[in-house]
């Protein structure tokens, strides 16, 4: 991928594997290529935005923009505001969420943010229910979709996200 094609972008949203070093490498390269006012956003599921921002000379222009899966049917965008994130950067991502017909939800820059701190507990408990023989995979997912009105059960969601990603979250 020739990153130079992104030099004139106003906003770049990174969505690579949940590996801090990889994200820092990409942000460091983008920092050198992009114009100073470019906003660099990460779709990370759990990595601290402030740590990703350390790879740049523009930590005030770095923000988290966590789109939940499946993106087309999920109604929110979790915005992660690190301490150095400027009001201008935060407001731009907030407006992006509105423009995409998503409900913006702000989270502090803590591991897992809001969504995955809660979700990972649910996925782990669903796995424990199957492991302990409390219910089958189908029963656990059916109950959560029907009783909690989730679009898919926690075990189906874990498969959809990818078990390797769930492990890193």
Regions picked out by a protein language model, each given a short descriptive name:
Residues 9, 23, 72-76, 122-123, ...:
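N-terminal alpha-helical segment
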